[in-house]
């Protein structure tokens, strides 16, 4: 079980799907709705240092209840709109609980995996729209 983590197997492992076996396990690392996400590829050092695992997301640094107290729906929407990110949500809580300020810096999280040879950065995905149910 990988609590708080996801597979980052290197190339040439039987457990990596055949179409990715020459590259390594694709790893998706989501950030916040305002910062984007990363695509990585698992590397050999992951097997020696982290049991073939890496972070599965930026991770929260603020509780949902604190985010509800500290942020308003309008300020989160304005912040995203100022970055050119369209936001559609059915609820106020869906907006404020997921404010980008509630999450760690996804770039810093990914850089740790990259620098330690656990997973290699392939592409950064930049948000253009967010839909919260």
What are these regions (language model features)?
Residues 1-133:
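Domain-length cofactor-binding catalytic modules of enzymes
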């Amino acid at each position: 079980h990988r609590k708080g983590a996801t597979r980052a197997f290197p190339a040439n492992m039987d457990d990596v799907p055949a179409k990715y076996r020459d590259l390594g396990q694709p790893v998706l690392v989501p950030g916040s709705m305002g910062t984007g996400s990363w695509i990585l590829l698992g590397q050999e050092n992951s097997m020696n240092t982290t049991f073939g695992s890496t972070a599965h997301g930026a991770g929260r640094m603020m509780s949902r209840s604190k985010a509800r107290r500290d942020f308003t729906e309008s300020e989160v929407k304005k912040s995203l709109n100022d970055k050119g990110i369209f936001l559609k949500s059915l609820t106020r809580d869906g907006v404020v609980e997921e404010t980008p300020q509630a999450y760690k810096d996804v770039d810093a999280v990914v850089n740790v995996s990259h620098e330690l040879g656990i997973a290699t950065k392939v592409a950064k995905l930049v948000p253009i729209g967010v839909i919260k149910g």
